């Protein structure tokens, strides 16, 4: 039995799964470790030593020894055994987390209580963990399993971690957004949405809008500096598309997401504002797509009766239609970023690129604050015009089950930029080659008809709408000249597409987009780099 001080390690010989083990708790490293120790004394930890960071312990409970089988074997040596159970995170394959339990048996009641008290005191110091959450459940999204998923996989973990909740099962579209505008959100430590990307978007818009209203910020002003919210958003995937969850956690698994919420993880994420004629249309965190992806989402809305199959049907129809759209894209390159769209360095937990880019962007903003001119008037805008099959802007990789690397594999979650991908008019065969590369390890940008830029602002004007939206075009002409390439004339009728904004249709072709660096925070930590499955045995 070991003694402990304020910051001294606690070490004892206990029993785990009928094996004699040395167990150590190191406050300085916030680490619980145990290893087999068959001989006298604790011994040194070997290769089979197990460990759990205190930050990944969910709860510690005194074990009901009468409910355990102790009538045979080595338990006979203990006249009155005592035990405590550590509930913790266990890493599984493919970035999944599992709820694991390890029970430690003690020969003395005093020793058992010492371990319980010490572990609980360390857990109390973890101030980033939520205590009270507001939960929105979409009972209709995906396969209609939202309520069942929450009750079976999430609620037990919240109860174990002593997290209290207020639950709202939504009955109509935009209910979550409207609720966040009306209620007192200061009493919560975070907002949890159970559903797909659509449900997350509702909560995102409600939280950002409520925060700006409280701060007196006009969201309709394209140059407005938006105020970040102090609340984090948790996503429990239960929808037809879970792109945001997959790109920030690495998997679409409800138990994994619930555990990230319980341990109080925090991940800052960029948000793009989309304006038209000084009116806010929407916010975007994943994909803004014009042309191919815009046509798919618009067509699929007419076929909701097909269920999830509508996306495949509309995708095939749009591919065969092979429409291209003429227009002008003007953008401000993201000079503050330390990466590039083709550097093959994906965003991972503790991302260096996001940290450095955030710091450099803050330095730029300070210089602009004390300078004579605004930074965007000093920096050089660029313009690309032509006929495009697709124009995509991604704030994240947009990875999902079908495309594990996403639309832009090296896009970063919190670097204050968006990857602008322009797909020029090409043959159906070449466009198919481009799409197929999203499902494998090949570089989807390695085509002559594909251009990709890392930007912090961009504007688009459709050729068909140039007369109506000439103010955007004329503003661009004063600052820069056009960069045009010679391409075969389009055989399609010149017309307008729609924008796919995180799965919602925007009917205005002319938009102005600005990236707001790390505007919101999620209960996530980013995708971990090659995590090894844990063995708490």
Curated annotation (Swiss-Prot):
Optimum pH is 6.0-7.8. Its cofactor is Ca(2+); Mg(2+). The modification Phosphoserine is found at residues 340, 408. GO terms for molecular function: ATP binding; ceramide kinase activity; magnesium ion binding. Residues 1-115 are annotated as: Essential for enzyme activity. One of its GO terms (biological process) is ceramide metabolic process. Its EC number is 2.7.1.138. InterPro entries: ATP-NAD_kinase_N (IPR017438), CERK_C (IPR045363), Diacylglycerol_kinase_cat_dom (IPR001206), Lipid_Phosphate_FormReg (IPR050187), NAD/diacylglycerol_kinase_sf (IPR016064). It is found in: Cytoplasm; Cell membrane. It holds the Pfam family DAGK_cat. The keyword Cell wall biogenesis/degradation does not apply. It catalyses: an N-acylsphing-4-enine + ATP = an N-acylsphing-4-enine 1-phosphate + ADP + H(+); N-(hexanoyl)sphing-4-enine + ATP = N-hexanoylsphing-4-enine 1-phosphate + ADP + H(+); N-(acetyl)-sphing-4-enine + ATP = N-(acetyl)-sphing-4-enine-1-phosphate + ADP + H(+); N-hexadecanoylsphing-4-enine + ATP = N-(hexadecanoyl)-sphing-4-enine-1-phosphate + ADP + H(+). The active site is at residue 197. ATP binds at residues 138-140, 170-174, 202, 239-241, 304, 310, 502-504. GO terms for cellular component: cytoplasm; membrane; plasma membrane. Inhibited by sulfatide. Inhibited by sphinganine, sphingenine, and N,N-Dimethylsphingosine (DMS). Cardiolipin at 0.1 uM significantly increases activity, whereas at concentrations >1 uM has an inhibitory effect. It is a peripheral membrane protein. Residues 128-278 form the DAGKc domain. Keywords: ATP-binding, Calcium, Cell membrane, Cytoplasm, Kinase, Lipid metabolism, Magnesium, Membrane, Nucleotide-binding, Phosphoprotein, Transferase. Residues 1-125 are annotated as: Required for binding to sulfatide and phosphoinositides. Its main location: cytoplasm. PROSITE patterns: DAGK. Substrate binds at residues 195-198. Changing residue 10 to I: 71% decrease in catalytic activity but no effect on substrate affinity. High level expression in heart, brain, skeletal muscle, kidney and liver; moderate in peripheral blood leukocytes and thymus; very low in spleen, small intestine, placenta and lung. This is Ceramide kinase. It comes from Homo sapiens (Human).
